[in-house]
Design a protein with these regions (language model features):
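Substrate-binding/active-site clefts of carbohydrate-active enzymes
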Residues: 305, 309, 317-503, 523-535, ...
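Active-site-proximal helices and loops of the catalytic beta/alpha 8
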Residues: 424, 434, 495-497, 501, ...
Length: 810
């Protein structure tokens, strides 16, 4: 165990052992095996109290002893029933602590893991609010406290001035004041960010320690030896955490030697194949370098791990009409955008077999829900009360039958079989929150569902508050499961298992995650692993949809819950930077760094440019949204459907795709974005897919651009696993170096309307020599081959363009 200099002065406490009786009537059998997975580094500000939910990373099984060994400088209390670990850091503690965790089951060998705590120097920010004198209470709410409206009250200092000084982690922090129960932005602070509901939050940027611009990267990999370096070179660390992450999910400290400052060598000869090594370091003042991680063996297959996936979201009804015979007659009550339009599983299979996804560089398909939906249309609860069909698939009428209008069970089986032959994995959209009122399970087991009527007599419809977060219904015809009923949870988990077995699936996209209790997700993951060997495969992927801040999203993620979720907070900043150009690249870099810090290197988060619940990127890029005539983006889609009128909007889209495909994580493409499809809010963002074979002009240029990017991503492990260091972050220009073992890539952007020449310091990651540009968009671009001399490179970028450079082949 590596402890910082200050922490090493304290003797270890006696081992804290808690026997946990965790046999729950929810889902599990008495012989459930314990599970432990890799734990990302958890950053904790000094002199604060933090609670960590260990159920994200471990599942002890029905009865096991859990042991932790905290140093005396660290107050750690573990709740035996909830596995919540409360940590209190002392004022003089900073740096890195490796906290051993061990699960001792009644039978079998113990499982050991490492929880690395990064104790960052305390940095307080002073929030002030000037009132009118009549205010009785002013509180601060934000991502840092889970948007709790009462936990952080401000103090009245004098007159009408209220204040609160609060230690916050570095990065952008969204917040609002709650004044006598009313939510308000900070009128004295001009910086804001979209809150995901059409409104704004105030935003404050908490700077990192000025000495923290240090990054670690895996420099080389040889049999039995991994070498990591620092950028800048020669950086001196005072505390170190080096952890070996083994294929079975356990982890342990491993020794790293440092023959010179900024260089670390790790003997990996004792580790099993496919193990990973993660290195983290801090300076004497507690400043943390960005950690790095590398596999000890060379990658041999580009889809053997979750981080190798490139996902394409096929929204079935809006894809290709492969069999017109299964198309229903139009419903006269329903406007065309909400009708079934003919796309089906046969059409998606045809796209597989004609090589579209292979040419596009896709290796994973996310299919929208395939469950049979009701034959008739239904009226939406909210005004103006439009009628909709179940074309989207989110009104399950059956938990076993595939929608006949999509081709039925045979069509899905044929699709997954064909996908397997063509090297594609298939991830199915799974609806676990509700069923349709005509579903047999609702008729046979009404006790499995919550009530539509609240005790006060009001309807529990779309009430997103904490009190009704897990019980509210989306529509009166969509009964909501009650997860306090063990039989209901058992039904949902066993049904998910059957879908995988029947159709040879590779994972699930999970709908409405935050509206389902945490205890269910623990049971869901455990149930899949117990009943499905494939669920323990490193390529099996559970990805969720949660519209929350990063901390809220992360609370559902870990090897004992979901593998990742869609990164909507990063999406918001990506949109404002590259589509609307209301923020600069410095904000985008800060948001990306914030995601990396909160989620961690081990987490397979999914960045995106949009999905079926969000207006298309091009609707914002072309200026159709926000629409001053109609602030509601869905209504804008009905009244003023988007259209692309400016060629520059496609250039913005291509830059966004470059950013997406060079990020860490599992990038997701929403169908049609690769062809420049536009659209405002749902359902305008769900238009039929244009025929890719007929793509011309900007659409064809964009399609070719995306295909080039995806193939580059698959060819270069630095994109998928490597360190990421921004070497230029200005308003309109941006450059990033990524490094992994012997692989190096450079990504550069010019958002401005004028050509620019960038002089970049690319060392130490990229040595002197030649680099080749892989994205040459015009004759005005730089030469294909550029030279790095004395660690510097000059690159010319046309207006609104991006470039990727890789070392020239000898």
């Amino acid at each position: 165990m590596n402890l910082p200099a200050l922490a090493s002065r304290y003797p270890l406490r006696l081992t804290l052992t808690l026997s946990l009786l965790l046999l729950s009537p929810l889902t599990r059998a008495a012989d459930e095996a314990p599970q432990l997975g890799w734990i990302p580094i958890q950053t904790i500000p000094a002199e604060t109290s933090t609670t960590l939910d260990l159920t994200r990373w471990l599942s002890p099984g029905p009865a096991a002893a859990v042991q932790i060994n905290p140093p005396a400088s660290l107050s750690a209390q573990l709740d035996p029933s909830s596995l919540q670990l409360k940590i209190q850091t002392q004022p003089d503690l900073q740096g890195l602590i490796d906290l051993p965790i061990q699960i001792k089951p009644k039978k079998g060998e113990p499982l050991s893991g490492i929880l690395t705590l990064a104790i960052s120097p305390r940095s307080s920010h002073r929030f002030t609010f000037t009132g009118k004198g009549s205010e009785k209470s002013v509180c601060l709410a934000g991502a840092f406290n889970g948007w709790n409206a009462t936990s952080h009250p401000l103090t009245r200092e004098k007159g009408n001035l209220w204040f609160l000084s609060l230690p916050l982690p570095p990065g952008p922090q969204a917040y609002k004041f709650v004044v006598d129960g009313e939510w308000r932005i900070d009128s004295s602070h001009s910086l804001t960010i979209a809150d995901g509901t059409g409104q704004k939050n105030s935003l404050v940027k908490i700077p990192e320690n000025t000495n923290s611009a240090t990054f670690l990267y895996a420099d080389s990999r040889k049999p039995g030896l991994l070498t990591f370096l620092s950028a800048p070179a020669g950086w001196k660390s005072s505390s170190l955490s080096c952890v070996a992450e083994l294929p079975d999910g356990t982890s342990r400290p491993i020794h790293a030697t440092s023959p010179q400052p900024g260089r670390w060598e790790i003997d990996t000869s004792s580790l099993p194949p496919d193990s990973w090594v993660r290195l983290a370091a801090a300076s004497e003042d507690g400043t943390l370098a960005r950690p790095a991680r590398a596999r000890i063996t060379t990658e041999t297959k580009t889809d053997a791990y979750r981080l190798d996936h490139i996902i394409y979201f096929a929204f079935i009804d809006r894809m290709i009409d492969g069999d017109p015979k299964n198309n229903p007659a139009p419903d006269p009550k329903v406007e065309k955008p909400a009708q079934y339009l003919g796309g089906d599983l046969i059409g998606v299979r045809q796209m597989i077999e004609n090589g579209y996804f292979e040419k596009l560089g896709i290796n994973s398909l996310w299919l929208s829900p395939v469950n049979q939906n009701p034959p008739q249309s239904f009226q939406e609860y909210l005004p103006p009360g439009r009628w909709y069909t179940g074309y989207h698939g989110y009104w399950p009428l059956s938990s076993t039958e595939v929608e006949p209008r999509f081709g039925g069970n045979d069509a899905l089986e044929a699709l997954t079989t064909s996908a397997r032959k063509h090297g594609l994995r298939v991830i199915l959209d799974l609806v676990l929150a509700h069923v349709h009122e005509d579903h047999p399970v609702f008729k046979d087991h009404p006790d499995w569902f919550g009530s539509l009527t609240l005790p006060d007599g009001t309807k529990n419809l779309r009430k997103w508050d904490a009190e009704t977060q897990f019980t509210t219904w989306f529509e009166p015809f969509l009964p909501r499961f009650n997860y306090d009923q063990p039989a209901a949870s058992r039904f949902l988990i066993s049904n998910a298992v059957e879908w995988v077995k029947r159709f040879n699936l590779d994972g699930f996209r999970l709908d409405a995650v935050k509206h389902i209790p945490q205890k269910f997700w623990s049971a869901f993951r455990s149930g899949l692993r117990t009943d499905l060997p494939v669920a323990s495969d490193p390529a099996f992927y559970l990805v969720g949809e949660t519209f929350m801040n990063r901390q809220g999203i992360a609370s559902f993620v870990g090897p004992a819950k979901l593998d990742g979720q869609f990164d909507f907070p990063l999406y918001d900043t990506l949109l404002s930077t590259l589509a609307m150009e209301s923020t600069g690249f410095s904000e985008l870099e800060a948001a990306t760094a914030d995601s990396e810090r909160v989620y961690g290197l081990e987490t397979a988060m999914s960045p995106l440019l949009g999905n079926h619940d969000k207006p298309r990127f091009l609707a914002y890029a072309d200026g159709d949204l926000p629409d001053p005539r109609e602030p509601d983006e869905e209504e804008a889609g009905w009244k003023y459907p988007s259209a692309v009128n400016h060629p520059s909007s496609y250039a913005k889209l291509r830059m966004a795709f470059t950013f997406l495909m060079t990020l860490p994580g599992v990038p997701m493409i929403y169908y049609g974005d690769e062809l420049g499809l536009t659209g405002a809010g749902d359902p305008d963002n769900r238009r039929m897919l244009p025929d890719p074979d007929k793509a011309t002009g900007e659409a064809k240029t964009t399609l070719d651009h995306v295909s080039k990017l995806t193939h580059l991503r698959s060819a270069h492990p630095a994109f998928r696993y490597g360190s990421r260091r921004a070497i230029e972050t200005k308003k309109d220009t941006y450059a990033i170096v990524r490094a992994y073992a012997e692989d190096r890539v450079l990504i550069a952007f010019n958002r401005s309307e004028k050509p620019v020449s960038l002089d970049l310091l690319v060392s130490p990651e990229i040595p002197d020599g030649s680099l080749e540009q892989e994205l040459l968009l015009s004759k005005t671009s730089s030469a294909k081959t550029l030279s790095v001399k004395d660690g510097r490179l000059t690159i010319f970028l046309p207006p609104r363009s991006s470039s990727i450079l890789v070392p020239a082949k000898p």
